[in-house]
Structures are given as C-alpha cells and as structure tokens.
C-alpha cells in the first residue's frame, strides 16, 4: 500500500487495466497539441482531418501516459 501511495507522488501511477475502460477525447477541451499522439507508444491515436482521434482503442494498455501529458484534461477514460 505504501509503495502505491509513493508511486502516486512520484507520478508513476498506472491506470487500473480493465477491458471495460473506454478512452475518448473531449474536443471541447482539446487544443490539438499532439502531446497524447506523441507520447503513445501503442499507436492508439492518429491524426485525421487535422485532429487527433482515437484510432486503435484495442491497442490501449491504460498506462496513463496520455492522461499525464494532456495539459487540458481532454483525455477521458471511463467505464463502459
């Protein structure tokens, strides 16, 4: 438990991996900075019509890197 708490303070927390999680982009908040696109190692995001889109949701490992780098809070992960 303590290591989990310390991990949070160190910014190393991971999102609980569950198959029922869905990732989306809130386009009311998204500034199209491409941070999520650049940080994702699993090619979850793509650029379509000059916008970042979720292209390969099945590739998402729920690592949380895109959530961490999004300064605008535009990445949403929720239960299906």
From Swiss-Prot:
Residues that coordinate or bind [4Fe-4S] cluster 1: 30, 33, 36, 40
Matches recorded under Pfam families: Fer4_9
Domain 4Fe-4S ferredoxin-type: residue ranges: 21-49, 50-80
Alphabetized InterPro entries for the sequence: 4Fe4S_Fe-S-bd, Fe-S_Ferredoxin
Keywords: 4Fe-4S, Electron transport, Iron, Iron-sulfur, Metal-binding, Repeat, Transport
UniProt-recorded Gene Ontology molecular function terms: 4 iron, 4 sulfur cluster binding; metal ion binding
Co-factor: note: Binds 2 [4Fe-4S] clusters.
Keyword Repeat on entry: yes
Cofactor(s) recorded in Swiss-Prot or TrEMBL: [4Fe-4S] cluster
Binding site for [4Fe-4S] cluster 2: 60, 63, 66, 70
Keyword Transport: yes
PROSITE patterns for the chain: 4FE4S_FER_2 (PS51379)
SUPFAM superfamilies for the chain: 4Fe-4S ferredoxins
Stated name of the protein: Uncharacterized ferredoxin MJ0061
Lineage, uppermost ranks: Archaea, Methanobacteriati, Methanobacteriota, Methanomada group, Methanococci
């Amino acid at each position: 438990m303590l290591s989990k708490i310390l991990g949070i303070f160190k910014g190393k927390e991971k999102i609980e991996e569950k198959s029922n999680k869905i990732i989306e982009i809130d386009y009311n908040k998204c500034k199209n900075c491409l941070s999520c696109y650049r940080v994702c190692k699993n090619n979850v995001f793509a650029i379509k019509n000059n916008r970042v889109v979720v292209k390969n949701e099945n590739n998402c490992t729920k690592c949380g890197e895109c959530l961490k780098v999004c300064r605008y809070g535009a990445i949403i992960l929720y239960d299906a």
